[in-house]
């Protein structure tokens, strides 16, 4: 294995490890974010803490980890692609010690955002259905006779009321809609992830460079971690309106009286008219609390060089 192959493999391992650790730590907050963004009209949850407490009471501790399995399975390739792609595009666009260029860094971030959606879109499509299942169950309690506009995951003609699984949802989507079913909301995902990467990667690089230590040849672990957290939280809040649109569009099953959306423009228009401009920032705090440690951990893993250490064991 050449040095370049070793470097790429190490980066993929680092991205995967960072994703697994990060998701395990912050998944309940991500679940709260999805449920807060999806509630229409009369609020079922007053905020993140209220959502987590009600979820724990109604569904138990593991109810807060609904959808975690699909995320843990796919977050490794997703984060690995995102971080490795950004690194690749940075090297491609800024060769031979070229001075830092904000435009080139933003282009590299754009490339990373475009690459990652291959995994991100189906992963979040499945995750959102599982995360929102508990909220929908409460919505429908005592309203079994009311007409519903939501889709059901069925096997045969009778509707099943069992807890949905990622495998069942994926199979139903593929059977009824083909591959396009798993990539529902692809445009909204691109619209969120490309701006996020354009903001995050250049911001992190410049913040991290402020703590560069000439003796060590890099910034300290603490500085890299904080830089990742700050850049991640700023980028996350900045694209929250786009994340709200993506979540609403990708949610297949709706509560009673909740709208279906034909696309990004239709979703934005209905959201503005029915819920007001503040609806576009639903879950912003949760999103910052999810993304900040995710990317702080990612940069910390890169700093420690876990991938390089693992590969050395096989030399």
Swiss-Prot record:
Ranges: Solcar repeats: 6-92, 100-210, 219-308
Query: Membrane-crossing residues?
Result: 12-32, 61-81, 106-126, 185-205, 225-245, 288-308
What phylogenetic lineage does the species belong to?
Eukaryota, Metazoa, Chordata, Craniata, Vertebrata
Q: Could you tell me the membrane topology recorded for this protein? A: Multi-pass membrane protein
Under Gene3D superfamilies, the record lists: Mitochondrial carrier domain
The record's Gene Ontology biological-process terms are: aspartate transmembrane transport; L-glutamate transmembrane transport; malate-aspartate shuttle; monoatomic ion transport
Gene Ontology CC:
mitochondrial inner membrane; mitochondrion
Where in this protein does the record put region Disordered? 141-160
Polar residues compositional bias, start-end: 142-159
What's the protein called, per UniProt?
Mitochondrial glutamate carrier 2
Q: Which family does it belong to?
A: Belongs to the mitochondrial carrier (TC 2.A.29) family.
Q: In which tissues is it expressed?
A: Expressed in brain, to a lesser extent in testis, and poorly in all the other tissues.
UniProt catalytic activity: L-glutamate(in) + H(+)(in) = L-glutamate(out) + H(+)(out)
Tagged with keyword Heme: no
- A Pfam family this chain is assigned to: Mito_carr
PROSITE patterns named in the record: SOLCAR (PS50920)
Q: Which InterPro entries match?
A: Mit_carrier (IPR002067), Mito_Solute_Carrier (IPR051028), Mitochondrial_sb/sol_carrier (IPR018108), Mt_carrier_dom_sf (IPR023395)
Q: Which UniProt keywords apply?
A: Membrane, Mitochondrion, Mitochondrion inner membrane, Phosphoprotein, Repeat, Symport, Transmembrane, Transmembrane helix, Transport
Instruction: Name where it's found.
Output: Mitochondrion inner membrane
Q: Sum up the protein's function in the record's words.
A: Responsible for the transport of glutamate from the cytosol into the mitochondrial matrix with the concomitant import of a proton (symport system).
Post-translational modification Phosphoserine, affected residues: 145
